[in-house]
Amino acid sequence: MKKMLFTSESVTEGHPDKICDQISDTILDAILEKEPEENKMNARCAVETLVTRGLVVVTGEVRTSAYIDVPTLVRNTILDIGYNRAKFGFDGETCAVITSIEEQSPDIALGVDRSFEVKSKEKEDPFEKIGAGDQGIMFGYATNETDAYMPLPILLAHRLAKRLADVRKSNTLDFLRPDGKTQVTVEYDENNNPVGVETVLISAQHSPDISRQELEEAIKEHVITPVIPENLVTKDTKILVNPTGRFVIGGPQADTGLTGRKIIVDTYGGWAPHGGGAFSGKDPTKVDRSATYMARYVAKNLVASGAADEVLIQLSYAIGVAQPVSINIDTKGTAKVDEEKIYKVVKEIFDFRPAAIISNLNLLQPIYQKTAAYGHFGRKDVEFPWERLDKVKELKAALGL
């Protein structure tokens, strides 16, 4: 039997890059929360964060009528993650916070506020008004491999990372500190079905007074065993806990973090392609974010409808243009109906213009900080509108399923 291994990784909320993602999305949420309802569609946010030893730098472009206390938001986010003592190497109370935030470029605003379609045809359709915030390609994916419609390796890696944070915050394992990483290797058979977990790797920041043996035993009992399904653990499954032997110095004390450096962790763990655009700190007129959510929404509903076992969707946009430049649907040979029919039905049922995506998925809510750690897709601990399965019935009827 041919053996195929696939590996995905995740990181905890205390990882330096994820600290930055959470800060950027916390600022976006504050804008969406404080902006008057009638003006939310005009609010803009593109915020980048850097964290390093004792320092946070927040920069970017924003358009809002609301007052946003950025330093306080930064400090509270860091404290909530768990960096609240100097001995952890980083402290939200005492770190320096530098901000350099400007207004959105008027050249960009020209095309986003009033799309190419409106300028050229004077269309009255409100969904034509907003153009894409940039050019680019975006991918969405779903598979019936798991009940979350996600590939198993990234799903398990996220759940291990979340579990690491949960047992730390509940003081179940009070020697843990905020930084951490997980990685899961899954074995697949010749039909691409998962048959076992080949390797579990966990690197967890810890206090200096815990022995390696105690740490390993505690991680196995309280993190790995509750997450990895028993039927996927074999006699050959390898468990690696802190293979360097020590992980006391972590977080921004050990590594500089930046917004948008964990884009594969954020999506499908490398199983599906990525267009390259990060999510955090971007308002939903940025199609890097909203169109990726839309592509996932469509792919998930298609798989749930029984149209295919897996679906990969690619979208592309031009800056300032409302309509997508291209839509590609790939079922990897698993379609139960004609792919041309699937494409036609998708274009009839779903609207891929940015304003329509924002409206239909209700993307002007302050929900983004929750996306900034443990993945944007396939979550059970939170509900996101792009994870809804509210088009399954309509798709089944249209596709004759």
From Swiss-Prot:
Top-level enzyme category: transferase
Example GO BP: one-carbon metabolic process
UniProt entry keywords in alphabetical sequence: ATP-binding, Cytoplasm, Magnesium, Metal-binding, Nucleotide-binding, One-carbon metabolism, Potassium, Transferase
Protein residues bound to K(+): E48
Cofactors named for this entry: Mg(2+); K(+)
Record's subcellular location: Cytoplasm
InterPro entries to which the protein is assigned, alphabetical: ADOMET_SYNTHASE_CS, S-AdoMet_synt_C, S-AdoMet_synt_central, S-AdoMet_synt_N, S-AdoMet_synthetase, S-AdoMet_synthetase_sfam
Cofactor note: Binds 2 divalent ions per subunit.
Domain of life, source organism: Bacteria
Swiss-Prot/TrEMBL catalytic activity: L-methionine + ATP + H2O = S-adenosyl-L-methionine + phosphate + diphosphate
Residues involved in Mg(2+) binding: D17
Membership in a protein family: Belongs to the AdoMet synthase family.
Role this protein plays: Catalyzes the formation of S-adenosylmethionine (AdoMet) from methionine and ATP. The overall synthetic reaction is composed of two sequential steps, AdoMet formation and the subsequent tripolyphosphate hydrolysis which occurs prior to release of AdoMet from the enzyme.
Quaternary state and interactors: Homotetramer; dimer of dimers.
Protein's recorded name: S-adenosylmethionine synthase
